[in-house]
Amino acid sequence: MSGTTREYKLELQDEIIIPATREKVFEALNDINILKECIPGCEELSREKENELIAKVTLKIGPVKARFGGRVILDPSKAPSAFSPSGEGDGGIAGFAKGGADVELIESDAETILRYTAKAETGGKLAQLGARLITSTAKKLSKMFFERFLRVMSGEIDLKK
């Protein structure tokens, strides 16, 4: 095998209706306790600076289980109608992942339509797993995040335990 580094890029888009006002949704998407509850595999999440988070996440992607240490930058410049988080994580021998999202929050009566486009790039062993596995895993993780987020926003998950 050659010494070249393999990389894989993907893009996901979706729209979710959340039973809360736009301001509450924006606030929740920036709440460290809510994010920690919703991010699949999140073990640690802390605020480094006002708009910068440090995370440790363990994920299994196909046969590869990796613990990522990473950083997320939150860009609240268009708050509360939109924001653009971006980040990168290093999974050691498993490789790396980096990406970002453009998130739009649209008011609709007492609900909010959350529309996003996320782009990600993986490298190392992760990229060698193939496009189909990486894309299906990314979709699954995204679905898990938003299912948990909806449960938190609807009060089904109580973070004040």
Predicted segments with their positions:
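Intrinsic-disorder/low-complexity, polar/charged segments enriched in Ser/Thr/Lys/Arg/Asp/Glu/Gln
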Residues: 9-15, 52-54, 67-69, 82, ...
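Beta-strand/loop substructures that line and gate deep hydrophobic ligand-binding cavities in soluble
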Residues: 89-137
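Hydrophobic pocket/interface hotspot
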Residues: 25, 29, 35, 74, ...
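A conserved amphipathic terminal alpha-helix motif
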Residues: 126-161
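Glycine-rich portal/gate segments that line the openings of hydrophobic small-molecule binding cavities
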Residues: 46-89, 144
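Hydrophobic ligand-binding cavity/cleft-lining segments
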Residues: 1-52, 56-60, 161
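A generic structural micro-feature
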Residues: 6-8, 47, 62-66, 93-97, ...
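Hydrophobic/aromatic beta-strand elements that line small-molecule binding cavities or substrate pockets
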Residues: 14, 43, 69-76, 99-107
